[in-house]
Amino acid sequence: MNKLFSRIALSALLLGAPAAASAQSISIDAANIKGTISPLIYGAGAEDVNHEIYGGLYDQRIFGEGFEEPEAINIEGFLPYDEVWSVKNGVLSINTSNHGKLVYQTDYAKGSIEVEMLLGGGSPIAGLIIDVQEAGNGADNFRGYEIALNKNTGHFVFGKHDHNWQPVQDFATTFSVSAWNTLRVDFDGAKATCFVNGVQIYKNSDTATPLLHGMFGLRSYGGSASFRNLKVNGQPVAFKQTAAGISGMWYGVGNGKYTRVNSGFTGKASQMIQGTTGDGIRNLGLNHWGINIDKDEAYHGTVYLRGTADKVRVALQSKDGSREYAAQEIDGIKSAWKAFTFDLQPAASDSIGSFVLELASDGYVVADQVLLCTDSYPFRKDITESFRQQKLTFLRYGGTMVNAEEYMSKDMIGPRIERQPYKGHWYTYSTNGFAAPEFVEFARLIGTEPAIAINIEDNPQDVLAMLKEMEPYNLQMLEIGNEENLFTAARPAYEHYVERFKVLYDAIHRVYPDMQFIHAAWWRADELETMEYVFHELDGKADFWDFHPWTETPQQAKDVENDIKNMQSKFLQWNPDTKMRCAIFEENGNTHDMARALAHAYMLNNVRRSNGFVPLDSPANALQPYQQNDNGWDQGQIFFSPSSVWNQPPYYAQQMAAETHQPLLVESELSRMSNIDVTATRSEDGKTLVIHAVNYGTTTGNLTLNLSNFGEVKSIKRLSLSGPANGENTPMQPRLYVPVEVDVEVGSKLRLNAYSYTVFVISASDVLGMEKHTADYPDDKCYDLAGRLINDTTNATIIIQNRRKFLK
């Protein structure tokens, strides 16, 4: 066959001084189609971890809407984070399976802290934290050094927190896992000397990025712990507790009497306010950060009330109540629960404002289910717009939140404000005001394909009732469970999952035969006998097997390609005719920086090369509040505060890929390259070629592109995202790392930055025809790209693929 070639030279741009580079090339045959690429690989995964939903996407400005949080416990001199701390007989305790810290509100540059500690239930890693700065809610949301004991391993642990976890030392030492131990640290700036039960066991000096002063605190991660006999510089500090009678996300206003009532309109609690005019409660939104009040925005609300007071007053105020922006009185309160609505138009803006509910006459009221929202309810407008601009094609609502016992579909339908709250995995006092139906509605609103996950113990009829409510949004994908048996390889656990999958599948499939099902049994490449059992049991029922790789760096993403190939190989070995494929519903990591962006870009190349075996891909997590970090999941793509939204490098990597999607993978071959990964894709009409290049090296490689069977090049566009591996965007510099788009003169050298994801879009003015064919192609029949025989080839453009003639 005669071939016509169009050649373009590509070179790379260095970050900093240029380095000598050997000749490197990529050869692309635009006519040799290697596979098809699903349009649904540009996804994102969301669940209510880090308050992505409640406090984030959900346009409910009140946090603690139903007063489910226990009453606030004040411990003199300390400020608590995450969980509730309590004091009994001088012993301070935290009862949790998650994490919490208690920070003493005095700054020290040097000193000595000593405490006796008893490790409790669960798997606690507990102890002291020093040089604490910038503390907030979230497991790693602070700066400081940690000195701790690990109950499970019997190890001493020393590490640094910088809104993340940086392990420094972890070694076995002698202490009791069932009795009191004495932990002490002597510190001078970033120098620390650590003692366990009076024995010096470790010294550390941080000279790289030292923290020279800060507060100290007590912390437990992964389980419960108790503390007593605290000494600061040898002087006892007593744990003294007072209770205000107010649910933990609210503050008292005035001098009223407050009681958290153990019943409510919904849920298990409500809030009583008793006193005179002006006595009330104040809410500051998520994490007490403040509610954004915009004078150009109308605010609407609902509150359920009962009581003896004739009327109450609702208001938008400054954080401390010194300024008021809008107010409205509510009357007609009776002894039975009744919903009251209100509208507030603020006279001024305040990015850290508050909402107040107070008595406007003597008596008492009991309040429950307080809603404050804007016209965009139930979706926060600025976050919605950021989602829309990312050009996602797929959204998954699922994750560990699904595994919570109370995560049940029966509580997710009906009027939002009347739904029952539930005990969540990531946040104990979770709301169903935003649940799976709202997420499906949201996905359709921004033009993406939704998938949701359900609890494997859910009732089939309840799930069907929820799906019925979702019918206007045409949900097509349903996952049963999430990461099932992640913590056990036991065969009976997998058998139970298979049993529950079938129960739910059979009921749902009968009513929704076109629904696609995803199963969530945890894939274990080292337990193939069990994997084969699951495969045979669910083959023909489950359309996809959910796979969650760890992809924090490009190097880790590179290794995943073999995992995908091995998975596909096993599927075909177990059943050559299987239609089950792989869905990557979570690419996971602990970061949201440039390294994570390049890792995702590399993963997309892996997925493209899978030739449709992986038609769905969604990195976690879709969004995250600034300085909110639960359990290390510091991996949001969209970041937000109460008043602003900005995007991280992985967001832009996904946006670049989605904007330049083409459906056909064409042959590409790299020569003499390291730390660079490339795929080439093409439009169906053959007029657009897209190159996705991931350069995860710190130096450049000069690329020469050898392009065959493509028309005359009309234009070239380059999109490039680059920066240091740890580069991320902040509220102060929200666009520090964003894609740069340039038009490149045809025929000139193109430049690929070091440590970058770069997309080249090459357009042709026409498509090369194949008027002469050699004996290599004896068949005169022609086909379309889907493999269908075409009889009329008049005015057709012929291409060659796998020794057969195809036309466009």
What are these regions (language model features)?
Residues 96-160:
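Secretory/extracellular carbohydrate-interaction modules
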